[in-house]
């Protein structure tokens, strides 16, 4: 189990993660695409990255909008693992 980040640690980490913000015990980013098909192409890339990392975001899809949330459930909050995964997801769609 990883140690959850303190609020100052989390704020520092979020400063380098475009689009991500704290939401409760998670970090979240919202994406907007031109249509449903583009949103699903992105979600499929997210799924591939998540499987490779062994760390899976919560995903909400509403037509062309995708919301991703990352938290380490076993730690009860955001850990370095979530920050690393958010960085990887930003590589897929900056």
Curated annotation (Swiss-Prot):
Keywords: Lyase. It holds the Pfam family Pterin_4a. CDD domains: PCD_DCoH. It catalyses: (4aS,6R)-4a-hydroxy-L-erythro-5,6,7,8-tetrahydrobiopterin = (6R)-L-erythro-6,7-dihydrobiopterin + H2O. Its EC number is 4.2.1.96. GO terms for biological process: tetrahydrobiopterin biosynthetic process. InterPro entries: PCD_sf, Pterin_deHydtase. GO terms for molecular function: 4-alpha-hydroxytetrahydrobiopterin dehydratase activity. It comes from the Bacteria. HAMAP family: Pterin_4_alpha (MF_00434). Belongs to the pterin-4-alpha-carbinolamine dehydratase family. This is Putative pterin-4-alpha-carbinolamine dehydratase. It comes from Koribacter versatilis (strain Ellin345).
């Amino acid at each position: 189990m990883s140690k959850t980040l303190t609020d100052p640690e989390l704020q520092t980490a979020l400063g380098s993660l475009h689009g991500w913000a704290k939401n409760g015990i998670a970090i979240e980013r919202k994406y907007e695409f031109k249509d449903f098909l583009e949103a699903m192409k992105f979600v499929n890339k997210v799924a591939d990255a998540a499987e490779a990392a062994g760390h899976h975001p919560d995903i909400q899809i509403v037509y062309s909008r995708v919301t991703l949330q990352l938290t380490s459930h076993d730690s009860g909050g955001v850990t370095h693992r979530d920050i690393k995964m958010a960085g990887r997801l930003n590589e897929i769609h900056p």
